Amino acid sequence: MKTAWTISLAGSATLAGATLTSSLPAAATTITSAVTPTPALFQHERVQLTEGVLERFSAVLQNDTVANMFAFPRNSTVSKSDVLHRCKVMPGDTAWPLDTTWDVFDDLLGGSLMKTVPLASSCYSDRPEYDATKCASITTDWLSSELHMADPASIMLPLYEGRSCLPSPYNYTSSCEQGAYPVYAVNVTTVAQIQLAINFARNQNLRLVVKNTGHDFNGKASGKGALSIWTHYLKEKEYLPAFKAANGYHGPAIKFGSGVQVWEAYEFAKSIGHSVVGGEAVTVGLGGGYTAGGGHSPLSSMYGMAADQVLVMQVVLADSRFITASSTENADVFWMLRGGGGSTIGVVTSLTVKALPQLETTTVTFNFTVNDTPGPDAFWAAVGLYLDNFERFVDAGTYGYYYIGASSAEIGTTYAGDTDYYFHMESFLAPNMSVAQTEALLDPWFNSLNALNVSYIPWYNHADNFHDAWVVSFPEEYVGTDVVKTASRLLPRSVFKNDDLRNQTWAAYQDAVDQGLFIAGFHISGTGIAVEPPTDTSVLPAWRDALTHVIVGSQWNFTSPWSVIEDSSLFVTKWMDVLRDIAPDSGAYMSEADLIEPNLQEAFYGVNYLRLYALKQKYDPTGLFFALTAVGAEDWEVQTTDPLPYSWNNNGRLCPKSS
């Protein structure tokens, strides 16, 4: 964004732009300290906003009204009196900052403020961004996660943004609007920029969102009228071969900037002879909502959740204080940000995680359809035999990512039923196992499939390290569409030890597919076989005894109207009652769950919620950070105009529930 106003050397400010003699310097200073924190701060973390910097800015500006827009709160913890609990300001409101104020903000940021437009706006001739060549390129790449992660405002799954601006092949209308895409984004490369953004949003009562890569299933990085903090380029990495953590861990560790993505983390770990716990999707950001929400991984059955690996975090809180959080320093923040979800009390700038052994790893991929079996009964018997092996597979430290459905599965269409069932094992991943060991583990199930006359051809891949096995087995995922609504449930070990509950689960799988739904599931445990999980995280307790994470989804056409989306959305939410009844004391993984999950605080957070909510009130009492399913979300509502029977959608004004 270009600087549009300046101040005179004499110090007289003119927001109207009449005096154009010199621009404001970036509001930041590089911190040096006699005491070096452990681990040492990254360069981007040493560039900070301080009271001294703001005092110098105020002295030059000689305009207290403008200077106070960027000030720290009066106390070390934000008070509700600083910003009244009221609806967030929107563009067009009289309280919305003037363009010249945004220009001041951009100057203080050092030029990193971006006025955003929807990614697909180049496809619409009535938009100033119209560019047919650019549109063609965007349309071609629209389903690629790399396209959306590289844009400051776009998200991977646009349904909960409001379907505001999609390329014509995917748009149900012929229009493009800003919708719930943020109106401004700060492309942060320093802590100071995050602090400025937080101060400005808090003091001006702006809606604030945080985007790392935009992977969240429920669109946490979107918000109508919002200012976004974009952490994508916080990419620093450091290997710590003999790190001593406050919790007693002594061993190799890696410090990652919060913008480092899974593929970058895996590559770096491999280069130094290690592995790390991260997501299966290539482009997920390691230090964003993934780890904050717990973070399941292809290595979870071996080592536990991503949150379990974190030894230290650096965080900018809602009062813009930059802190270190560990098991002994700001321990309540450390607890909350490892499992309590993203968009709650602050912005993580880096995290230090355990560096794990570089394990040999085998992966297996295979498929079978009903046409590869004697018939539907044999197909579903084969699926049931997989369920029977969940416990054995998880106890061996393996992970399986599978799909079950029918090729015509779509609510409201003619359904071909049992003529097109399919089972697809995207990847059966066996860490610390050779091909022969993996074959031996799979033999009992495969022998049973052979006895059923099920045809399948397993493809084995082996590498002497996790990264090389993972990279060929987990392709970039299908994103960018608004045609899917999902719900999920974690099913515990007790379900599969009980014949009646196991049979109910097997019948539920078949019923889901016969109802036109699809299943995307994982055999997985949140308690790794190699280590005991830490006791000081806020990870949903249901993860610790889970044997499978089951996602069930409905789908519709790109051109479907809101009425079809409403019916399909409510249908899958209601259908999930089947699994909720089978495992009533379990829960759901918040990052891959139903936005309108009943009793979502219990489902996503379990017994941790009361403490999480109390910490939310302690560290963010004004509700600066908000997301639809985040801690404290029940105090707010998004007043949408979309024709849905619920207000949980990011495309609307954010207001307290009482307003």
Residue ranges and their predicted role:
Residues M1-A26:
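Fungal secretory targeting signals
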